[in-house]
Amino acid sequence: MKRIVSALLALAAGAALQAAEVSVAVAANFAGPMREIAQAFERDTGHKAVVALGSTGKLYAQIKQGAPFDVLLSADAQTPARLEAEGLGVAGSRWTYATGHLVLWSPHPGLVDAQGAVLRSGQFNRLAMADPKLAPYGAAALQTLQHLALLKTLEGKLVQGDSIAQAYQFVATGNAELGFLALSQLLVDGRLRAGSVWQVPAHMHAPLRQDVLLLVKGRQQPAALALMAYLRSEPARSIIIRHGYAL
């Protein structure tokens, strides 16, 4: 019995020594699913994911300035490709972990119709979106307004947040009646939040393909390598789909 107990203690000590932290930069639109993935990742591997949220543009700037991130979960494909080309990401490590959906949402029932005609009516004071220079979902919102030939008409009503999370706050707090957001921000236990919504047709903007990249700092970090693998696992994929993303 003593030998068995000693063996179990040795195994536990070994597991504790192997467990590590991975520092993850995560695009703001992916905050909800990443919280769940981080919990499942720690439960299944023993490793802990320390998450920093922000707009993709700001995360890129932080990485360029030497921020100690091991992994980047971007809201686009271009930023990871740029970091890889600049030698800040591990060559060949990036891949698409999710494809997002842009929506127009208001907490007011009936304000947003199924075709987004409210944009042409102009019967609102403020329209929120993320800064297109910093956030891919903001760029998609801008492209949508350009596609509809409404940018010039509505530019005086636009309010921009640094990230898609701030754009959501503008709408949720009543500082804007409606806003362009990520579908994932509106799902609670698989159901849409109360209000009214238009899912923007995909042809109106560039695809919201979201890539993950192993950064140079994390290339020899067991926890970083484990997270890169875990994002492909069935538990992670199920969480991503449940939050409104395509794979």
PLM region descriptions:
Residues 20-53, 57-67, 74-77, 81-90, ...:
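Exported/periplasmic ABC-transporter solute-binding proteins
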Residues 1-3, 71:
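Intrinsic disorder/low-complexity segments
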Residues 3-16:
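Bacterial N-terminal signal peptides
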